[in-house]
């Protein structure tokens, strides 16, 4: 049991639902966007769509229980590489992140072996030309973004964008930091390994944002984040085909809200309990 009265099992939040019984993270917290390589919604049927290199055929990959269906993925990609064409949105808003250009699709299998971090499947962006994107969005502050990643490279941007008026994550030599409205905010997070990052923005005042790494707040430098809007999500680069990220990604979740402390802790613990990050 956790201190918040919940017990976590995969994407389930047990006893957290208003009517009692088992429910999923998305069912209880209603994010705007929810990409994850596990089942986090009771209505989700697929996590990713994969193209195999050998013949360019594609297949939707769903779940085995609440985990990614690794058997279906390895069977489909037996002896060849697999690339993600679609990261399905489990929020119910149908905001799937896609990449139609074969050479720009991030990898999920190498010669039939699933790419993984800490024993769980992970999507690999090569830092050269890979991306997954969703355009045509409408969003502004307040906002909460959560990402589970494992960085390899030391530069690049990913997150929510509208040209340079952005609120995104910026990779650095050590960890990552927030980049907003053309300015880099300090300080960096500390880890170059698998990490769960959360960025929350609230009102238009100084110190109106918070940044967390593996459940602990990183004290910011007091910058006022200012007004922002976004109209697209780009998971491994800027939407201008620049600033690519060499990293693994397992989850990206966004709320058009400033999630409460109670929700933040519950969501972080849910993700950590499945992926065993810290």
Describe these PLM feature segments.
Residues 3, 210-217, 246-251:
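Short acidic (Asp/Glu) and glycine-rich catalytic loops that position anionic groups and cofactors
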Residues 66-78, 176-179, 227-233:
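Short, surface-exposed linear segments at secondary-structure transitions and domain or protein termini
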Residues 132, 244, 262:
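Residues that form or flank phosphate/diphosphate-binding pockets in enzymes
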Residues 2-106, 116, 122, 146, ...:
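GGW-centered surface loops in extracellular recognition modules
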Residues 1, 9, 39-45, 49-58, ...:
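Short, flexible beta-strand-to-coil junctions
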Residues 185, 221, 227-250, 254, ...:
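Extracellular glycan-interaction patches encoded by glycine-rich segments
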Residues 46, 176, 207-209, 247-250:
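Repetitive beta-architecture junctions, highlighting loop-to-beta-strand starts
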């Amino acid at each position: 049991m956790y201190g918040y009265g919940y017990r976590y099992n995969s994407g389930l939040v047990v006893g957290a639902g208003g009517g009692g019984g088992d429910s999923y993270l998305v069912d209880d917290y209603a994010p705007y966007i929810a990409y994850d390589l596990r089942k986090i919604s009771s209505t989700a049927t697929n996590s990713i769509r994969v193209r195999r290199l050998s013949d360019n055929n594609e297949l939707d990959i769903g779940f085995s229980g609440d985990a990614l269906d690794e058997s279906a993925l390895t069977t489909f990609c037996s002896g060849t590489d697999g690339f993600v064409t679609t990261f399905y949105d489990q929020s119910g808003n149908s905001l799937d992140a896609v990449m139609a250009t074969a050479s720009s699709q991030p990898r999920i299998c190498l010669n039939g072996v699933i790419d993984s971090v800490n024993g769980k499947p992970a999507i690999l962006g090569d830092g050269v030309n890979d991306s997954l994107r969703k355009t045509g969005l409408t969003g502004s502050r307040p906002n909460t973004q959560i990402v589970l990643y494992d960085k390899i490279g030391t530069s690049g941007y990913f997150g929510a964008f509208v040209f340079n008026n952005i609120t995104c994550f910026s990779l650095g030599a050590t960890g990552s930091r927030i980049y907003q409205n053309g300015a880099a905010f300090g300080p960096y997070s500390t880890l170059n390994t698998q990490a769960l990052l959360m960025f929350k923005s609230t009102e238009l005042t100084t110190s109106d944002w918070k940044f967390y790494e593996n459940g602990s707040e990183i004290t910011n430098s007091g910058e006022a984040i200012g007004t922002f809007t976004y109209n697209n999500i780009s998971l491994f680069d800027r939407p201008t085909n620049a600033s690519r990220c060499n990293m693994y990604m397992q989850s990206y979740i966004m709320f058009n809200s400033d999630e409460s402390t109670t929700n933040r802790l519950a969501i972080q613990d849910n993700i950590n309990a499945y992926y065993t990050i810290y």
